[in-house]
Structures are given as C-alpha cells and as structure tokens.
Curated annotation (Swiss-Prot):
Similarity field: Belongs to the bacterial ribosomal protein bL35 family.
InterPro entries: Ribosomal_bL35 (IPR001706), Ribosomal_bL35-like (IPR021137), Ribosomal_bL35_CS (IPR018265), Ribosomal_bL35_sf (IPR037229)
HAMAP family xrefs: Ribosomal_bL35 (MF_00514)
Name used for this protein in its record: Large ribosomal subunit protein bL35
Organism of derivation: Syntrophus aciditrophicus (strain SB)
Gene Ontology terms: cellular component: cytosolic large ribosomal subunit
The UniProt record lists the keyword Ribosomal protein: yes
Keyword vocabulary terms for this entry: Ribonucleoprotein, Ribosomal protein
Residues covered by region (Disordered): 20-42
Gene3D superfamilies: 4.10.410.60
Any single GO BP term: translation
Pfam families, alphabetized: Ribosomal_L35p (PF01632)
GO molecular function, one term: structural constituent of ribosome
Amino acid sequence: MPKLKTHRGAAKRFKLTGSGKVRRHHANASHIMTTKTTKRKRNLRKSTILDKRDEKGIKRLIPYL
C-alpha cells in the first residue's frame, strides 16, 4: 500500500491539539474590517475547535500531523 500524502492546503490551515481535536482559525478576518466592531475583530483573532461533523474529513487530509 502506498504512503498517504498530506493535503498541503489543509496542513497550513489546521492543527491537531494534544487530545486529537482539530484547531482552526475564524473566517471573515482578512478584509472589510471597518464595519466590524473591535470586540468582533478581537474574537476573530482567536482560534477555535473544528466541529465534530467536519473532523473526520479533515483528519483524512492530514494523516501525519
């Protein structure tokens, strides 16, 4: 069986936590920031845990991370 290749785009966007959960960054934080409140922009800077429904597919893309 051949080696599995890591999806490089996914590897740059997602990280695994110590407990095996997938960490991701928030969307909507790159431009058109003037209409967003300071509180909203501050919260968008933080990372969050990926939803369980999406976890299986992402873990398949990044098998060795």
